[in-house]
Amino acid sequence: MLDSFMTQLEIVGNRSKCVNMLLWSIFGFGVLKATTLILRIMACFVDLFVLPPVNYSKYGSKNGNYCVITGASDGIGKEFAFQMAKRGFNLILISRTLSKLETLQKEISTKYNVKVEVLAIDVAKDSEDNYSAIKELCGKFPITALINNVGQSHSIPVPFLETDEDEMRRIITINNTATLMITQIIAPMIIKTTKESSKKTRGLILTMGSFGGLIPTPLLATYSGSKAFLQSWSSSLAGELKEHNVDVELIISYLVTSSMSKIRKTSMMIPNPKTFVASTLRNIGRRCGAQERYATITPYWSHALYQLAIVEAVGVYSHLVNYINYVFHKSIRIRALKKAARDAKKQ
């Protein structure tokens, strides 16, 4: 009888130990998760509001070196041109419209006393002539920086099964094929310049990403997929070029006033290109809102906090986020179709 009682006590004790171990494991995991969250929030705030602006002398500014910028004639690309020139870089500007490039060339070279080369090509045409022209022009100059800004989205949100084939091909060609081909041409030139530099000059490759690539976006499926591809490609390239002293970063942005976004009015969540580019160049090398991602930066403060909230609260691949994104872009599509119908009646 006593032996049976003692056996039962031993069983209960063992079960109690197992329960205690389980509870302590859950508690430990909770503490680890909370600590990680707190550290990420702190790191984000330090990146955004505490650390001083990045010094671009390490990338060879004010030393005769060039920065190549694609999609440079309008919006964010145009602002990158102004602000990189202000930091002392000579420029090679690549875009589609020669008249815009020549106007920009004259304005920047006069204002900042830097050399500006321009090349007018349409990267939507995936031709060998385009890439040969880029290689021929850029091969003449010492290059330490490349900004892959050129990009294309849908004209309006559209279901994937209704997406025009030409629009789909154009998005993939501009956002992906052209970006990869141009980077493959320019990156060896950057490595060559940094190796030949008498100073410890680093190289820099920036690529424009998007919240559309961060979060799967119904009704912008092709664009969303093209930007998600850039995330994985850019982070992979960062690992490859690290040994060559080239910093590679993907820049994540939410909405910015531009011709592509079709938004003209700024707000707390929607900066203009000048403000967005200033926050980007101030924080290169820091993750800001992209704390969970390697070689990635979400530089504008409201975008950074928005990303941090989504990632830590529900996750970018959650059904809730996908549904909210769908409803949001469906409403944009409905308004766009109504506007198109009204415009058609006026004609």
Swiss-Prot record:
One of its GO terms (molecular function) is ketoreductase activity. The keyword Cell cycle does not apply. Its EC number is 1.1.1.330. Its main location: endoplasmic reticulum. It catalyses: a very-long-chain (3R)-3-hydroxyacyl-CoA + NADP(+) = a very-long-chain 3-oxoacyl-CoA + NADPH + H(+). Pathway: Lipid metabolism; fatty acid biosynthesis. It is found in: Endoplasmic reticulum membrane. It is a single-pass membrane protein. Belongs to the short-chain dehydrogenases/reductases (SDR) family. Component of the microsomal membrane bound fatty acid elongation system, which produces the 26-carbon very long-chain fatty acids (VLCFA) from palmitate. Catalyzes the reduction of the 3-ketoacyl-CoA intermediate that is formed in each cycle of fatty acid elongation. VLCFAs serve as precursors for ceramide and sphingolipids. This is Very-long-chain 3-oxoacyl-CoA reductase. It comes from Vanderwaltozyma polyspora (strain ATCC 22028 / DSM 70294 / BCRC 21397 / CBS 2163 / NBRC 10782 / NRRL Y-8283 / UCD 57-17). The lineage of its organism: Eukaryota, Fungi, Dikarya, Ascomycota, Saccharomycotina.
